[in-house]
Amino acid sequence: MKLHLKGLRIAFFGTSDFAAYHLFVLIHCSIHKIVAIFTQESIKIKQKSSILSIHTISQINNILLFQSYFLSQSQINHIIKNLNIDIIIVVSYGVILSQEILHIPKLGCINIHGSLLPRWRGPAPIQRALEHGDTMTGISIIQMNSNIDTGDILHSTPCKISPKDTSYTLSKKLACIGSIALLKTIEKIILGTCKNIPQDTSNITYAYKLNKKEAHINWNKSAIEIERRIRAFNPWPVSYFKIKNQYIRVWNAEINKNSINTDQYNDFQPGTILKTHPNGIYVITGSGIIILTVLQISGKKKIHVKDLMNAYSSLFTMHSVLT
């Protein structure tokens, strides 16, 4: 016998493109009604990706939108109570919800998190997984409590990390996985078949918030570490270096595998340009050579090194040192 599920009244809390994808799927692929959206996203944010922004989705679908940095916690509490919400769904929201809000919805609050908890609790799980060379990550859906990402796990789905994944590409993969998992989890919550699994406290790591300073490339690190960070910080804050008073952003790089585990470049200062080539700029690091392939001069568009060198070859002379 086929069960007929009743649609829920949902309040959605989310800010990023990652959140927007989940919101889009909830609206267009479920029977549930999004009655209010709360976001930290500025209305001035321009569309920079193929994924609709939170604001655009709310406008197209005529859903109440609240920019929560203009509201106090008590005001948010009041709004949620008056809207008769069944469940709150939180995806990459950026602010901790108060204890009172967590207890208002009949079915509580659930959070979609971009890692296999308890690994990478915190605000930057996708970036930190890439930075640390993880080969596997995933999506966790948890029942929220008063602490950060510590609630019982309702659902988890693993996802392989490709050697070429950036935060942008991995976020897109996880958004696809997470949105499907979210629909399944809501159905289980309605049916009362969801199992709450406490997190394993023996494997906790924390994904600290990103900042622009850490995007400054430290050439004393190994080529492997630098390449990971370049992928982790794409599309924000974007790794960068300085040469001849020019700030250069690095969007893509490769490791020269032949240079790993060799000491033949120990006499060179890390950051020294070994050579330039149509396929990239070869730079000596604390261990190994990294090949910079896609760069962006300040105020210009990102471009492959092969094309960049036609206009800026004087910037990247052999044995110049990047800082």
Curated annotation (Swiss-Prot):
GO terms for MF: methionyl-tRNA formyltransferase activity
InterPro entries: Fmt, Formyl_trans_C, Formyl_transf_N, Formyl_transf_N_sf, Formyl_transferase-like_C_sf, Met-tRNA-FMT_C, Met-tRNA-FMT_N
EC nos: 2.1.2.9
Keywords annotated in UniProt: Protein biosynthesis, Transferase
Recorded superkingdom: Bacteria
Positions that bind (6S)-5,6,7,8-tetrahydrofolate: S115, L116, L117, P118
GO cellular component: cytosol
Family: Belongs to the Fmt family.
PANTHER family according to UniProt: METHIONYL-TRNA FORMYLTRANSFERASE, METHIONYL-TRNA FORMYLTRANSFERASE, MITOCHONDRIAL
HAMAP family for this protein: Formyl_trans
Protein name: Methionyl-tRNA formyltransferase
Source organism of this protein record: Blochmanniella floridana
The encoding gene: fmt
